[in-house]
Amino acid sequence: MSEIKRLEINYKTDELFENFRAFGNKDLYMVNELNGQMIDASSDSPFYGIFVGDQLGARMALLKKGDVEEIYFPDFEDYILLWKLEVLPKYQNRGYASELIDFAKSFNMPIKAIGRNDSKDFFLHHGFTDVEAKNIEGHDVLLWKPIR
């Protein structure tokens, strides 16, 4: 199992994200999330990643309900939004995305995910359910609920 590290919000993190911008889908770019927040490293950073050597190979953001949206699931007091899960092509098929999902599940809170870029089946494979709704961009909304 890989070590999942919280990524600080600073210029170094922006440089690490550059590799993802070089190949990725523009919907997954995190540059806007970093703009204006790079004065000091933040202990409240929502960004997590897996390093392969000194290169960031996989990343995601875990946001709290209300950080980027209004309450979406009225059935839950609180939940996590798993946002922009991405693995660089040369590191795909090594289980890194699954490890990030398992890390998010370890908080034992409901998780909302958006099925972008053909990821819906991946989330379904990991126990998420399709809530039969679309976000404002037309992507599928999925939910994982912990067993209580």
Curated annotation (Swiss-Prot):
Keyword Transferase part of the UniProt annotation: yes
Cysteine-cysteine disulfides: none
Enzyme Commission numbers on file: 2.3.1.-
Gene3D superfamilies attached to this UniProt entry: 3.40.630.30
Record keywords: Acyltransferase, Transferase
Residue stretches making up the N-acetyltransferase domain: 7-148
Superkingdom to which the source organism belongs: Bacteria
Molecular function per GO: acyltransferase activity, transferring groups other than amino-acyl groups
Record's protein name: Uncharacterized N-acetyltransferase SAV1176
Species lineage: Bacteria, Bacillati, Bacillota, Bacilli, Bacillales
